[in-house]
Amino acid sequence: MVSSFTSAPRSGFYYFAQGWKLVLQPGIRRFVILPLLVNILLMGGAFWWLFTQLDVWIPTLMSYVPDWLQWLSYLLWPLAVISVLLVFGYFFSTIANWIAAPFNGLLAEQLEARLTGATPPDTGIFGIMKDVPRIMKREWQKFAWYLPRAIVLLILYFIPGIGQTVAPVLWFLFSAWMLAIQYCDYPFDNHKVPFKEMRTALRTRKITNMQFGALTSLFTMIPLLNLFIMPVAVCGATAMWVDCYRDKHAMWR
């Protein structure tokens, strides 16, 4: 079935909302199951453990607040909780994406074929097995780009004042951009678009991608909803690829 998507790009919020609709399309649901199971098992267990630890971690983080900011503690405490949720949520969503990367790529490929009527070159389990080394190499590229930037931001958390005020905002913006890269990369990688070229393409529509990544980041922090976010984000990012990038970067049509 060829999609009714227009070629006119929409906002990142629109594509995120489309993701929730697309995962339910007949013929697509079976490709959603494996990414969904990985996310439910990993994120469900991780967040259950996290909420048992918050009573210890938050007071420790608040101990870095200098005396002159103590009067703002009632505002800083929620920021500290959000900071922990952001860092923790992104860390475990990264692990989940590593494990599910081949299946996310297959989901993006099948959805793109359904939206455009195009025929992908290799499909099914044998196509996945053949592409696993390349897919894992691509995940390493993303991780190598992400890690040094994440370390710098994490160091900011231990600077009194900055760690409880500025750092959470910077981390949220960074997470939004990184999640846009993470999920938009699946359709780009299906067409063998180099990682650097993919980032350059995303920067041409930075606001759209930041909107998409910000909503994905927010939903990653929400219990229960975060269990479904991986396949939803893959579908939303694939819809964005079809509208905004496919004409210029597609390898198969």
Curated annotation (Swiss-Prot):
- Biological process GO terms, please? cysteine biosynthetic process; sulfate assimilation
Subcellular localization: Cell inner membrane
Provide this UniProt record's keywords sorted from A to Z. Answer: Amino-acid biosynthesis, Cell inner membrane, Cell membrane, Cysteine biosynthesis, Membrane, Sulfate transport, Transmembrane, Transmembrane helix, Transport
For membrane topology, the record states: Multi-pass membrane protein
GO cellular component annotations of the record: plasma membrane
Q: Where are the transmembrane segments?
A: 31-51, 75-95, 151-171, 222-242
Q: Which GO terms describe its molecular function?
A: high-affinity sulfate:proton symporter activity
Which Pfam families does UniProt cross-reference here?
Answer: EI24 (PF07264)
Protein family according to the UniProt entry: Belongs to the CysZ family.
Q: What does this protein do?
A: High affinity, high specificity proton-dependent sulfate transporter, which mediates sulfate uptake. Provides the sulfur source for the cysteine synthesis pathway.
Name this protein carries in UniProt: Sulfate transporter CysZ
The encoding gene is cysZ
